[in-house]
A protein has these predicted regions:
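Terminal domain-start leader segments
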Residues: 1-307
Length: 307
């Protein structure tokens, strides 16, 4: 399908779900600055290949918001797609919520995996003020099947303590102390750099970064990494077992959170995606939004070895 055909297919699916608009951000479920091609949904639906942009599709319009760094590129790549460029660096350019409140009605769909908790809640509040309803629906994945790049499966490997200067056990002890101070028994981590730092692991899932696509849930008596089994060879299994890390499949993080037992849970609302938040066991009513996360705070203070 070309871009025009994809837009037609998306609008058909929107109609089926009873939504009047769909927002497709240029992000991934981990709020990464650089992401794997599997999640380049904004580019797939618009044809724009720049690193920063957000698409909005209604039943009769398609628009792309991007900043002034990409105006020339967007003008060239959007030709023939029916997608209109919205120059968000220009002073008279409306924000996406402003435009939606002025030009559509009813409900707006977003994939909750592509929005942080904070971003989702802020968008929801603004849209509701304008009389619109925000719905959590993934409308791109059902359409983008053929030719979609797989989630990368580079091998997980240990980043040795002689380079990190601190053991996983020590880092987890400090994290659990921060959890205790907030009266929480669980912490959800989705930022890939934080996971790599906490568990002393690395990967090659994203070009030019040593990241490994995964989630982590830290509890008071265990720590679980959610990662594709294809990323784990014998050495990786041995390392994770040695440092006491439990292993679950990447997609199992949602069902794990649904049955998680804790009185309180911590998360960084600027990084953790809305789908993870929505999956948390509803019995856990104490939900502490910390930004930045305790892991990022610790990561930012370098020890002598790292210096």
């Amino acid at each position: 399908m070309n871009i025009v055909d994809r837009l037609v297919a998306l609008r058909t699916l929107m109609q089926k779900h009873g939504v009047n608009a769909c927002i497709v951000p240029g992000t991934d479920p981990h709020a990464s600055e650089y992401m794997a091609e599997h999640w380049t949904e904004m580019s797939w639906i618009t044809g724009f290949l720049g690193e920063t942009g957000t698409a909005v599709i209604t039943m009769d319009e398609a628009l792309l918001w991007t900043d002034s760094r990409y105006y020339l590129q967007a003008e060239a790549e959007l030709q023939g797609t029916t997608v209109k460029l919205m120059r968000e660096s220009d002073i008279d350019c409306p924000t996406i919520p402003q435009w939606l409140c002025q030009h559509t009605e009813g409900s707006v769909a977003v994939n909750p995996e592509m929005y942080s908790v904070n971003g989702y809640r802020e968008l929801k509040a603004i849209l509701e003020e304008g009389g619109l309803t925000l719905k959590s629906i993934d409308l791109i994945s059902p359409l983008w099947q053929e030719g979609r790049p797989a989630i990368p499966t580079s091998l997980l490997y240990e980043y040795e303590e002689k380079y990190t200067g601190e053991s996983v056990e020590s880092k987890l002890q400090r994290v659990r102390q921060a959890m205790t101070e907030r009266r929480c028994q669980a912490l959800v981590i989705s930022a890939l750099d934080e996971i790599g730092w906490l568990l002393n692991i690395r990967g090659k899932d994203v070009d030019y970064t040593p990241c490994l696509i995964s989630y982590v849930v830290v509890e008071m008596d265990k720590c679980t990494i959610f990662v594709s089994p294809n990323k784990l060879d014998a050495a990786a299994h041995a390392y994770l077992n040695r440092v006491g890390i439990s292993i679950c499949d990447y997609e199992q993080v949602f069902t794990y959170l649904q049955t998680l037992q804790a009185e309180g849970i911590m998360y960084d609302g600027g990084k953790v995606n809305e789908a993870l938040y929505e999956a948390i066991n509803p019995a856990i009513t104490r939900r502490v939004n910390v930004s930045p996360s305790p892991v990022l705070k610790m990561q930012s203070v370098k020890n002598a070895t790292e210096l």
